[in-house]
UniProtKB/Swiss-Prot annotation:
Organism: Schizosaccharomyces pombe (strain 972 / ATCC 24843)
Gene name for this UniProt entry: pku80
GO biological process, one term: double-strand break repair via nonhomologous end joining
Domain Ku as annotated: residue spans: 229-461
Primary location group: nucleus
Annotated catalysed reactions: ATP + H2O = ADP + phosphate + H(+)
Keyword Nucleus: yes
A GO molecular-function descriptor: ATP binding
Domain of life the protein comes from: Eukaryota
Localization in the cell: Nucleus; Chromosome, Telomere
Reported function: Single-stranded DNA-dependent ATP-dependent helicase. Involved in non-homologous end joining (NHEJ) DNA double strand break repair. DNA-binding is sequence-independent but has a high affinity to nicks in double-stranded DNA and to the ends of duplex DNA. Binds to naturally occurring chromosomal ends, and therefore provides chromosomal end protection. Required also for telomere recombination to repair telomeric ends in the absence of telomerase. ku70, of the ku70/ku80 heterodimer, binds to the stem loop of tlc1, the RNA component of telomerase. Involved in telomere maintenance.
Protein name as it appears in the record: ATP-dependent DNA helicase II subunit 2
SUPFAM superfamilies, alphabetized: C-terminal domain of Ku80 (SSF101420), SPOC domain-like (SSF100939), vWA-like (SSF53300)
Any one cellular-component term (Gene Ontology): Ku70:Ku80 complex
């Protein structure tokens, strides 16, 4: 379960916040609200039910708080009571965040009002409490009781962050020129107050530089496995060691936000213009536009050609066995489950250098020992041994009872004097695609080889990202790189939520920082790259083109595994479709209807028999071209369906019948059959076809 977080923003809405200072084009309030809106967008995108927000403004024209009976709390308004961040409500509140007509209102009193809101909402429950103050610190501030207030904040674990417009900050060498004496004194006292409650005090300029930085969601560590780590024969206690360990995710792919289908009508377009105070009504209205998906299962009767609906519970799993569907019930699938025991079991060890780099195909997980002395001692000794011997461990891992075993490589990892193992899943034999690629031609000229080696060596040295000439700031490190797609989409969602008709701004500098190599380094490599390009000119060979898959078979040219698989399984995807089943081979379109009949379950025998009759009829009707096309299709599918003997017998009978008629054109047809490669299927052609399947 994620931590419950309560955040209260304290905003300075004084009259002075409406002016621009030091050449800025935005007023002080607009400037500080840019951070406020950026923080809210993070909360909307996170969409956590345990994350609540409150907004308190001071130096307001009116007073709206529970402590307003005392004069010290006048001109302070609770603009948004602590609750879940609702976009429509916060959008209406944001429209009221404008400079007031007064300078009355105390900052310390506003902090007290915010603390009172937190205390009543969070009570004594475990919350992560944050109070963010955005102010220019102009005017008079009452610091008479700040020590007692700081003690209360510390006692209730409230984090206080004060980010001030044009605050002086020594550690970044920033100071505002011609600062007013009152503002300067306020900054000093505010810094003392913040430091006394262990908060954060900094100038808003530093905060503003981080606005738009991709937000990385923090995830609480949750163990995905707890069990035994066995070294040796686990069945024998005398010859094995069992360590209690826990497994945690280390790296996981962050996916972009997913979209949902909604129906946009006139009411949903005008909805955001309404000011609805009841959140239940709001949620119900938004959910009414969501599109729900209903799935139905239809079965077609091949005899009557009618369809009828069946329930999901009445369906069974089926697997294709050639063109036959083999059903396996759920009870049978349970019987097929492996009788395995959860845990890690060490199989052996390999040198680090023997692991192919492309074998790491999975996410990474980290293994830590349980919090007892014996487990930590044994585990630490095992990790240190791997590190000293420069080896990895191979382990068999099962995550649950009767689970599927996987093969892992365990890598030693030491961080902050703590010992861990990082596990990465290895592929099985069927998971590897052992493609072989043609070699590049070697240069016969030794002088050319020497020049290329020298140029490549210079290029590598000049493109060193750790050098002082590198233009990346900050340096190129994994923690400074961000995935473009999810963060760019989040930026678009946040922008269009506030400005539906606006133009999406350019991607943030944090996303585009490492999209191109540093120009300063590339300029040093121009001559080397030019030499490499001249010496290593690669001519791409022209790929042969085939008009059809039959041509590829007839010419002996290889076709891809995907093309063969498509031919073999071309009918499976349409068995449950809306297309009507074709039950007979027609003389108008013999090739097309023959292919469709083959898609039917148990349609092979009918398709071959009818195609043989159609070819004979076409010859009798002197439609020789169509007969040759049909014979070519029959020959190809006879190879694919292992009906070679039947085709050869049929072709022998067909030739004999044609020659008995003794017609000149039919005799010419026999010659065309031979010249077109449609004669009897020989053994070497079958061997060539088998080689295609093994590609």
């Amino acid at each position: 379960m994620s931590d419950k977080e309560c955040t209260v923003f304290v905003l300075d809405l004084g009259k002075d916040m409406g002016t621009c200072h030091h050449g800025r084009s935005h007023s002080d309030l607009e400037w500080t609200l840019s951070y406020f809106h950026d923080e809210l967008s993070h909360k909307f995108l996170a969409n956590r039910k345990t994350d609540v927000v409150g907004i308190v403004g001071y130096k307001c024209d009116d007073t709206k708080n529970d402590l307003a009976e005392q004069e010290a709390y006048w001109n302070i308004s609770v603009l948004y009571p602590i609750q879940t961040a609702l976009f429509s409500k916060l959008q209406s509140v944001s429209q009221t965040l404008k400079p007031s007509n007064t300078m009355q209102g105390d900052l310390i009193s506003a902090i007290v009002v915010s603390f009172d809101l937190m205390a009543r909402h969070c009570k004594k429950n475990k919350w992560k409490k944050k109070m963010i103050v955005l102010t220019a610190a102009r005017g008079i501030i009452d610091f008479s009781d700040y020590i007692g207030i700081a003690e209360q904040l510390l006692q209730h674990d409230v984090f206080l962050g004060v980010y001030g417009v044009d605050f002086d900050q020594e550690d970044i060498n920033y100071s505002e020129p011609l600062k007013e004496s009152q503002k300067k004194e306020n900054e000093v006292r505010i810094q003392e107050f913040v430091e006394s409650c262990h908060g954060q005090y900094c100038t808003f300029q530093q905060i503003y530089n981080n606005i738009g930085k991709p937000w990385v969601r923090k995830v609480r560590p949750v163990a995905i496995f707890r069990g035994t780590f066995s070294i040796g024969n686990r069945d024998s206690k005398d010859t094995s060691i069992s360590i209690q360990v826990e497994r945690y995710p280390r790296t996981r792919l962050t996916k972009p936000p997913t979209s949902s289908a909604f129906y946009e009508n006139d009411m949903s377009k005008n909805y955001e213009c309404l000011n609805i105070e009841n959140s239940n009504v709001e949620n119900k209205s938004m959910e009414s536009d969501a599109v729900s998906t209903v799935r139905s299962y239809m079965v077609r009767d091949p005899k009557t050609n009618d369809s009828f609906e069946v329930k999901r519970e009445d369906l069974e799993s089926g697997y294709s066995y050639g063109r036959t569907i083999v059903p396996i019930s759920r009870s049978d699938e349970d019987v097929l489950a492996l009788d395995t025991i959860p845990g890690y079991e060490i199989l052996g060890f390999i040198p680090k250098s023997s692991l192919p780099i492309y074998y790491t195909i999975s996410d990474t997980n980290i293994i830590v020992p349980k919090d007892d002395f014996e487990s930590k001692l044994n585990f630490s000794a095992f990790v240190q041994s791997l590190e000293r011997e420069h080896r990895y461990a191979l382990a068999r891992f099962v995550s649950k009872d009767k689970g599927v075993p996987v093969l892992l490589v365990l890598m030693p990892y030491v961080e902050f004097k703590r010992h861990y193992l990082v596990d990465i899943q290895l592929p099985f034999a069927e998971d590897v695609r052992p493609y072989s690629f043609s070699e590049f031609e070697k240069l016969s000229n030794e002088e050319d080889m020497r020049q290329i080696d020298f140029a490549v060596s210079n290029y590598i040295d000049n493109m060193d990202l750790d050098s002082s000439d590198c233009g990346f700031n900050p340096p190129f490190e994994p923690e400074n790189t961000f995935s473009m797609i999810p963060h760019r989409l989040q930026q678009a969602i946040s922008y269009y939520a506030n400005s539906p008709e606006g133009d999406l701004p350019q991607p943030n500098i944090y996303l585009t920082r490492y999209t191109n190599p540093p120009k300063s380094l590339l300029d040093n490599c121009i001559l080397d790259l030019k030499l490499i390009k001249e010496k290593l000119t690669v001519n791409v060979p022209v790929k042969p083109k085939y008009s059809s898959q039959e041509t590829a078979f007839d010419t002996g040219a290889p076709i891809s595994e995907e093309q063969i698989e498509e031919l073999l399984n071309s009918g499976l995807d349409e068995q449950e479709g809306e297309k009507l089943l074709v039950l007979h081979v027609s003389e108008k379109d013999p090739v097309g209807t023959f292919t469709e009949v083959l898609k039917n379950p148990f349609g092979l025998e009918d398709a071959l028999t009818e195609m043989e009759k159609v070819i004979k009829n076409l010859i009798d009707k002197s439609k020789y071209d169509l007969a040759l096309q049909s014979l070519q299709s029959l020959r190809l599918h006879s190879i694919l369906e292992d009906e070679v003997e039947r085709f050869n017998e049929y072709l022998t009978r067909l030739k004999k019948d044609v020659m008995q008629n003794n017609k000149p054109k039919e005799n010419e047809l026999i010659n065309k059959i031979r010249s077109s490669g449609l004669d009897i299927i020989l053994h070497d052609e079958l061997t060539r076809h088998d080689n295609f399947n093994n590609i």
